[in-house]
């Protein structure tokens, strides 16, 4: 069975446009009046990725034409040929046996058609009709009112004069001197207007010599049209096509206009190709005033066993100035992204993600528009893997490579390539209280100029669980065996990173096939007490949950083992209960530790957690030789969360070390909802000798239509902001506008220290959305969703 890609809405124009905007997305409207269900539910507080709000018509006034809309009427025009015609009226003159003269609340119904008028002449033989006075007509897909309407019910054609019309599958409406229905699917309006705004309050509209509506293709076509904002014409369009339902169609998408410090002014005029129901493409030619032309493209496909997307950007001759370590001026440049998922058999899939740039400075030069500057990109990864999973197991075989896209560093900063890797995990319940599991991995690590080799890691375990809702004990016994096979010239490398040694250097790698084997034993236990309490007049359940976690791992000297993909993780609350503080298999910490922690929660009557506070610390019975400290205690780690209502929340964490007698880490995040459509975030993050930063972000509604957006991150050590964004948004019944400017210290994101040539860069973008006609593709949303928690 052929599958269909999701629809894309667009504006098709047969002339070069000077509009400001970008790619359009699907928009539909309900045929009835605006109801409370049309409004969007606010994203819950604390949600990291809130979906963009779809175009909303909640601010639109009800169309008076909908007063005669009959929702019980059929929406199937094909029933006309087999359905009888029903005519009702207060007065009927049938002196002519073939022509009936009806007056007084006349109604004519057949299948999806309904005609109302003050008077009507109906020929029972030819089925011709002539309606006059307060004519109202409904059929599948549209409503219209007119002063006079003539037609034939069998042929499904008619002509109406002095027309006002309303589309039912979209909010499109307008007026026309004449409306002509050729059949059940095709209508043409002469000297007509079209808009999705409130009737009589068109913020935008186009006026055309003719507007043709084809319900079969879902396309409307206007000829000799002028686009107007209010009453002011600003663009002549000899030909314009637009969607009248949610079907996809080929045509121009809205252009995008932006500006960045390295690209200059940018103009993009994408063209969408609806090739088939299950695959499509977009061509995206661009002009950068500071760099020259670019051709971009996207191809999407969806088949029963495979789906994917291919994106490419190509610059034939870059005119920009050199930056970083590579000279790319007057060269070809490109970026390729390919993703694919193919079902092979059963639960096995082939998953591919290929990303490649022509040079290390590509993202630095072409990543400044707001669509791609949500985060600094330093490394591109490409992965191809075959993955499978069952009820108790998962496995994968694949390869991963990396490309450096930081123009200020060499490829030495890259991670090891994994060529190839294989993983297998299982977790099998043996009894209701006993389970057996295993995590295994085999990887070949490759990196020019550094020690290379293969590593196998085997990690089986046996765990039991005893407990009730009031207590639990979870003993676990594991065994970790790690083996290496280093390349033949392994003794030429040394140091903490395994780099090539110079003359006279001595390698710490003494064996070509070193191994490490050790047991890992832990016992996790806890109690849970609860009581009823009240706070601020509300009833809650308060819990008290003490927890003890003992971990024993014997010491193994691992100095002769290379470090391929392992890092010491940042210490946090969950590290109190972790068997290893290292992220990879190259290092396994030794331990003879006991963690003591205490948590208390407040749960409301629905079981929703409204407050939680946790405090914990590790006691070391012996020095940590692999990590490298002889502390008796770890830092105190505390967490606090509070959300007594759905309109605000507070999260905080804190670490204080009795060893250094200093604060090691602290964070504070406050989120407050402002009105129905606003949000305010205040944050502070600190990590000793690494980071101290304040942040404020939010969306502030000025009115139902206007709102301000902004975010700023201030670095205390640097004494200035590292990133700031500010903008304004306007949203009405039928038009939405977004304008955002971003100012940031770009080089700091690429790891350069302060004072090493850092400069402030800027990017600006403007989006316009004519609701129901097309949109810009939410380019700005990706940036604001990252910088403003809870943004929609």
Per-region residue spans from a language model:
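Outer-membrane beta-barrel proteins and related beta-barrel translocases across Gram-negative bacteria
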Residues: 63, 88, 136, 142-159, ...
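Hydrophobic aliphatic residue packing
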Residues: 13-17, 106, 135, 458
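Selective for proline/serine-rich intrinsically disordered segments
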Residues: 4-5, 29, 34, 42, ...
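Gram-negative bacterial Sec-dependent N-terminal signal peptides
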Residues: 2-25
